[in-house]
Amino acid sequence: MKINNKEYTIPELSFNAMCKLEDMGVNFADMEKKTLSTVRGFLALAMDGNLDKAGTELEKHLASGGNIEEVVTEIGKEVEESGFFQALKSQ
């Protein structure tokens, strides 16, 4: 995902990555209700777990006219295509 002209790569969304997101406060049942926290968590995952740095980058991104919906769409695509969620859907 591109934030402030920097490209961040969300790591493979494995079981362990999902646990890290939960440890950072990203609750998959509340993803639609807590969009900003979810986006910050995924960006932090791409930034070695630094929630404060991720929040600062997102704030700068929005202040400079960046679009949060594009980031949300990209995260949704990554989640849907992850092997972890594919396995869950097939159960």
Predicted regions and their residues:
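Amphipathic alpha-helical repeat elements characteristic of tetratricopeptide repeat
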Residues: 36-37
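Charged interaction scaffolds used for protein-protein
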Residues: 2-7, 15-16, 23-33, 49-91
